[in-house]
């Protein structure tokens, strides 16, 4: 009876996993094969020649080297993750632990911001960055990503802080600890899984972004990895080996991040779903 209970969900999960894995395997196989073999069908295993030439050509592309794009993506993604997580954690702790007159209205406004489409804000943001001389700069894009991530990280961390027991904090107050000392030395270590989970999600979102980078970065030398990918397709024909190799390298960074911190996924799911 117990086996039957889990059989159907497991079959569904495995079916979905295989459906996602087959296209990825196709991309991976195309990235390590010569162009002549790819155009005959990536699923044909004879002949099957393994080469790293596609990766080398993608990294050292004469016009849009993906290596420079990966570096630019890291320059944008790392501060765009650290800054909003720090600021949002402070605000989230205030929402979770303190009472002030407009607390509920302000939090409702933050939740409303999460539903705001990027397309509605891109025009005023464009003129704002242009007037501040931040258009076409990494700093401008970092500010936009950081501001855009604040709302959901506040919501995420507020729920996570609300789950934490308050006994240790109350004991620290009795011992004379200040609010900041309690937050820095007690709450943050307890909330480390939630902080890392929020950081992973924010980093992955910034790394995968194409729309904001396309609007605010116009200098080809500053293009991030997601901007360079479609430019590698060629003008007269598509070099599938080059394009798939670049795609694998761009995908590899968030995949590695998820693989290293996968044990925090459960905490992240709880942080989103539980509200106190």
Curated annotation (Swiss-Prot):
Source organism, top-level taxon: Archaea
Gene3D superfamilies noted in UniProt: MetI-like
Domain ABC transmembrane type-1: 70-261
Alphabetical GO biological process terms: transmembrane transport
Keyword annotations of the record: Cell membrane, Membrane, Transmembrane, Transmembrane helix, Transport
Lipid bilayer topology: Multi-pass membrane protein
Primary localisation category: membrane
Alphabetical list of InterPro entries matching this protein: MetI-like, MetI-like_sf
Keyword Nucleus part of the UniProt annotation: no
Family annotation (CDD domains): TM_PBP2
One cellular-component annotation, GO: plasma membrane
Keyword Transmembrane: yes
Compartments, as annotated in UniProt: Cell membrane
TM annotation in the entry: 12-32, 75-95, 109-129, 137-157, 186-206, 241-261
Described function: Probably part of a binding-protein-dependent transport system PH1036/38/39. Probably responsible for the translocation of the substrate across the membrane.
Family (UniProt): Belongs to the binding-protein-dependent transport system permease family. MalFG subfamily.
Full protein name: Probable ABC transporter permease protein PH1036
Native source organism of the sequence: Pyrococcus horikoshii (strain ATCC 700860 / DSM 12428 / JCM 9974 / NBRC 100139 / OT-3)
Lineage per the UniProt record: Archaea, Methanobacteriati, Methanobacteriota, Thermococci, Thermococcales
